[in-house]
Amino acid sequence: MGKRFGGVSLAFAMASILAVPNVHAQDAAARLSTPVAPSDPSDVRDMETVVVTGVHPGPGLWRVRRGDHTLYILGTQSPLPKSMTWRSDEVREVLAEAGVVLGPPGVRVGSDIGIFRGLTMLPAAMRAARNPDGATLDELLPADVYQRWSALKQRYIGRDRGIERKRPQIAVYELYRAALDANGLREGGVITPVLDDVLKARGMKLTPTTLEVKIDDPRAALAEFRKEGLKPEDVSCLRETLDVIERGLPQVATRANAWAAGDLDVLRATAGQGSQLQACMSSFLQTDTARKRGLDDLEARVRAHWLAAADQALDAHPVSFATLSVNDLLGTAGYLAALRPRVDAVLAPDEADAIEDVDAEGIDAATP
């Protein structure tokens, strides 16, 4: 599903996380499974993979059984082909019967400051998106990294002096999104509209599974964060994102195409290739500002919170629905792996359901 940041620009959401709700924390430490070797800035690989267009079915639904209750889970993927249309009939049928529709796991970092005071904090959040003391990226980054950044910025963004004053994680994410767009890919806009449409028609609301974390001193936290200088994790985030933009977009497109076509074999083979936004989130979670406020252990807390919501849905409703990233469904350490010991069966979209098979055999046997 698309990321929601309460109306505040996603471009500085990582820096202003303390003032922005509903930041998804899953896959926070994910990295591309095969690191891409740095290349000469002039040797940027053009896309070799054709991004699909038109109508496509998506990967299907995972089924989690507990007794006669079923939780259906749609695996999400970002980015996806920009010009595809998702054939969502199967999901719409399940949503029409679901007693509850769970939102994706995540964390909502907020405070009891009220809407008006929250609006007055937006300038502080925007300042937190910039480098301390007005520094520019050419002053902060190693020379070789800045050379790569500059070449890719010229290619995908053009002349934009303002971006040079933004923190590395934010600046490189804007570059990443521009590169995706130029290559027929996008983040969001495929799955969420379908869910919203069905929920609106049924008069239902999405049931959030986000962990609520309160910050007593958001303004002070933003002030502290603004003072924090460049850390090794910040440079690693930028460097790895440049690797993807320079050499890894064909693999990104292959995974996007696989989701669209429902090619589970390719999705399994490429499991672990995490969202670049989520990969860079880990650099924020390692800041002193985050550690002092207990935000550095969010991954385990968010997972436990989602598992509790899934347990409740399975206990209370014959049919329920949720979304998780494909990585969390396929990985051995993901949310689905943690849920497996708590339920009777977990079935992938390409796995037969024993109950359905028995029913089908009974019908065949009764047919003269």
Question: What are the functions of these language-model segments?
Answer:
Residues L10-F12, L195, Y335:
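Generic structural signal for hydrophobic residues
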Residues V23-A30:
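Boundary at the C-terminal end of the N-terminal hydrophobic targeting segment
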Residues A19-N22, A365:
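Intrinsic disorder/low-complexity segments, especially N-terminal tails and targeting/processing regions
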Residues L32-G294:
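Structured, acidic catalytic/metal-binding patches in enzyme active sites
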Residues M1-L10:
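Bacterial N-terminal signal peptides that target proteins for export
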Residues D288-P368:
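A cross-kingdom marker for long, charged
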Residues S9-A19:
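Bacterial N-terminal signal peptides
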Residues L10-F12, R65-G67, L314-A316:
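Short hydrophobic "helix-edge" motifs at membrane interfaces and signal-peptide entry regions
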